[in-house]
A protein has these predicted regions:
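Periplasmic c-type cytochrome electron-transfer domains
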Residues: 58-76, 254-255
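A short beta-strand-turn-helix
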Residues: 71-88, 116
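Structural alpha/beta surface segment adjacent to cysteine/selenocysteine redox centers
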Residues: 86, 94-183, 215-218, 248, ...
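Conserved beta-strand scaffold positions in the cores of enzyme catalytic domains, especially
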Residues: 80, 124-126, 229
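C-terminal cap of thioredoxin/glutaredoxin-like
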Residues: 2-51, 58-61, 109, 179-257
């Protein structure tokens, strides 16, 4: 029966004593931990830098713990344009990544603004209703527009988002693109970026979404006219309804849209 190999006073093939070998092993172990620590620190720097700072990642999903009682939902803040005393209140629930919303924003919204809002007939309120399950950038886009609103440029940013929807809607991440758009509309990009790369306005957008759900909104764009669900196939149909509700006679000049 072979004898167990015994530990000798020198390590095989090295000429080193056992004590020296153990010391070298401890030194190598320390070096490994130092290297691992440096690597971990580098990863942390990369992780934080990719998010634009220590504030955390840009919020792209609704907030889970937003209160849903009726009183809280009534505090959902839409973005308003027009006189508060206008006879007709038009509420829009929209998604920045929705193609139909893009068509409405491009062709119908300018007519509403010029012919109804600016004439004192309509007060329009836009609520965010991001269909985040099918439009992965919609929630972030809604937040981005509200970050622009902090600097008084909501509608300018709104228009750019819709005009360039085909570009950003197919990107893997839209954060940097949205920051570029901030510069396009003349925002302080540093302030905008700090807002976007955080959870700022996430609760506000979520409250908009929950309010729409409570009112039965299921798709975008959806509209309420003086509190009643409304559909219209053309701008002219909407204008006729507005004049009717305001008790006024429509102008003789009409549009073909």
């Amino acid at each position: 029966m072979a004898k167990p190999t015994k530990q000798t006073s020198r390590s095989r093939g090295t000429g080193k004593s056992a004590a020296t070998t153990r010391a070298d092993g401890r030194k190598a172990s320390r070096n490994i931990w130092i290297i691992a620590g440096v690597a971990a620190a580098i990863l942390v720097v990369i992780f934080v830098t990719s998010r634009g700072g220590t504030g955390g990642a840009a919020a792209t999903q609704p907030v889970a713990n937003v209160e849903m009682d009726p009183a809280s939902l009534q505090t959902a803040r839409g973005i308003e344009v027009g006189s508060p005393t206008a006879p007709v209140q038009l509420h829009e629930y929209a998604d920045f990544q929705c193609p139909a919303c893009q068509q409405f924003a491009t062709f119908i919204h300018p007519l509403i603004k010029e012919r109804l809002v600016d004439q004192g007939l309509v007060r329009m309120v836009r609520y965010d209703f991001p269909l985040f399950n099918i439009h992965p950038h919609a929630f972030l886009a809604a937040r981005a527009a509200r970050c622009a609103d902090d600097q008084g440029k909501y509608w300018e940013y709104h228009d750019v988002l819709y005009a360039r929807q085909p570009t950003w809607s197919v990107q893997r991440s839209a954060v940097n693109t949205f920051i570029e758009y901030a510069e396009t509309v003349g925002l302080n990009t540093s302030t905008f970026e700090q807002c976007l790369r955080s959870d700022q306005h996430a609760e506000e957008v979520t409250r908009n979404l929950r309010l729409g759900e409570a009112l039965g909104v299921t798709g975008t764009p959806s509209f309420l006219i003086n509190g009643q669900r409304a559909t219209f196939g053309s701008y002219q149909e909407l204008e006729d309804r507005v004049y009717q509700m305001a008790g006024l006679t429509p102008p003789a000049e009409t549009t073909s849209n």
